[in-house]
Amino acid sequence: MDAAAQESLILELHAIEAIKFGTFVLKSGITSPIYLDLRALVSHPGLLSSIATLLHTLPATRPYDLLCGVPYTALPIASVLSVHRSVPMVMRRKEAKAHGTAKSIEGAFRAGEAVLIIEDLVTSGASVLETAAPLRDQGLVVADAVVVVDREQGGRENLAANGITLHSLMTLTEVLAVLLKHGKVTEEKAREVRQFLDANRKVTVPGAAGAVKPKAVRKGFAERAGLAKNPMGKRLFEVMEAKQSNLCVAADVGTAKELLELAEKVGPEICMLKTHVDILSDFTPDFGAKLCSIAEKHNFLIFEDRKFADIGNTVTMQYEGGIFRILDWADIVNAHIIPGPGIVDGLKLKGLPKGRGLLLLAEMSSAGNLAHGEYTAAAVKIAEQHSDFVIGFISVNPASWSVAPSSPAFIHATPGVQMVSGGDALGQQYNTPHSVINDRGSDIIIVGRGIIKASNPAETAREYRIQGWGAYQSSLP
């Protein structure tokens, strides 16, 4: 935005009395000699349209898929921008409905999509954070916010501490300079406003309401291995460090023959192989021993994606017995927490004596899934209560969790990874290695079709390993 356009916009805002001088109590609780009331924009469609267009020109740190206006003044701005640029919009409810769908976020969206927050003005950043929190709880990525006016009172810094970059059309200092230049404010009043700004440069978020935790400083895998309470969790970190690989291949093939051949091809590049033994049409009792031999040869762990979801007694039998005898050959299994903590007790009863580990399904990568918010928080609580057996989580966007694990010993593995983001006809959502590791705070990328459908799975696995490990290294302090 050039200086002439900015000056014209400031004068137009003053002309519609959107800029006022006097004594005003702000949302942050402080008393201000200047107040910006952009609610008047709804009565001036031409100016509203111009502001929406100008906000679109502000550069975001990453491409975005959705818009979300902060309730309520920014909603018409976001709506106009959505229509002008054909960018879908979602809406945050200030309070979730107690009836109907009881949603906190309205609109069509998919976990992993990036949202640009739109606000009229920012003081402490509290309103933006209050909007970012429920968006992130739904698995959406919030990295940027655009605003008409930055009051320069700590909002930019508060948002940055919570992983959000603020982009503004103008600052309060620039507003004051233009109004003074055109005789719209006296020098005495301008001095009063400048003194007010100097005295209130760091306004904190009131009560930290809606604040998202600052992005945690990532510890290296070698250091985290020393923190692990479970031997398999420790070994996984050690394998990752030794092979410089945070790649897990999802071997979703139809026969044991195909799976064993794939394991030989990709084994040198992976830290873990994910199986679905119950889809193998030619399964035989010696399958586990054959796979373990390949895993030992190439130094990777075996993760049976069983997704246990029954009561403790039943999962104990499913784990140890049946025709698959998963306990005998799978280093790691996973489970839903729908039945409650008893499912972990049942699996631990058999798995812990053999040094096995468990991943809890805290989130899923399919569109419309219900594993988020309180469900995810419950998974974290159960994991911390069973940290001797639970080694981590199947996650989609752990950086957005409002309740994060207290220990970095827990590992995050994220499915639905491909070189290019997108989705399939059955609702699976794909994200890139860099996005999963850097933006979403995961540790392991789980890649299926991107490798197993490739003409050269070994070479493709190597490319994914290099990308995944590079993303991990770039995320370290």
Curated annotation (Swiss-Prot):
GO terms for biological process: 'de novo' pyrimidine nucleobase biosynthetic process; 'de novo' UMP biosynthetic process; pyrimidine nucleobase biosynthetic process; UMP biosynthetic process. It comes from the Eukaryota. Pathway: Pyrimidine metabolism; UMP biosynthesis via de novo pathway; UMP from orotate: step 1/2; Pyrimidine metabolism; UMP biosynthesis via de novo pathway; UMP from orotate: step 2/2. Pfam families: OMPdecase, Pribosyltran. The active site is at K307. Its EC number is 2.4.2.10, 4.1.1.23. Gene3D superfamilies: 3.40.50.2020, Aldolase class I (3.20.20.70). One of its GO terms (molecular function) is orotidine-5'-phosphate decarboxylase activity. The keyword Lyase applies. Keywords: Decarboxylase, Glycosyltransferase, Lyase, Multifunctional enzyme, Pyrimidine biosynthesis, Transferase. It catalyses: orotidine 5'-phosphate + diphosphate = orotate + 5-phospho-alpha-D-ribose 1-diphosphate; orotidine 5'-phosphate + H(+) = UMP + CO2. Coiled coil: none annotated. PANTHER family: OROTATE PHOSPHORIBOSYLTRANSFERASE (PTHR19278), URIDINE 5'-MONOPHOSPHATE SYNTHASE (PTHR19278:SF9). In the N-terminal section; belongs to the purine/pyrimidine phosphoribosyltransferase family. This is Uridine 5'-monophosphate synthase. It comes from Oryza sativa subsp. japonica (Rice). The gene is UMPS1.
